[in-house]
Amino acid sequence: MLNPSAADPAPIFAALGDRTRLALLGKLADGQARSISALSLDTALTRQAITKHLHVLQDAGLVASLRVGRESRFAARRETLDEARAYLDRVSRQWDETLGRLKAFVEG
């Protein structure tokens, strides 16, 4: 699957803009692949709701699924998170440069 973040980071940030999806990604942050059943522990969400949120994360390239026997397991895709971080770093640098120019103009 082509990583959606390569051309447009918006789907990544849209997927991250939900508290439930952030919590799911947090559970996967240790690098371990987990089943939907494992991810639904300690939550009031149904397995169907967890599945829906995981598919949004998967469509954004933030998680990958793999089959283990009859079970689907999901794991975080660190490279997509790294791409999102790199995008935010670029935007931050651009703002720093712009604010630096504005400061020089105002003080100059």
Which residues are covered by each model-predicted region?
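N-terminal helix-turn-helix DNA-binding core of bacterial DNA-binding proteins
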Residues: 2-3, 7-46, 68-82, 86
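Alpha-helical residues within the helix-turn-helix
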Residues: 41, 52, 58-59
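Residues in the helix-turn-helix
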Residues: 49
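C-terminal structural segments of small proteins and small subunits
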Residues: 77-103
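Short, charged, intrinsically disordered terminal tails
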Residues: 104-108
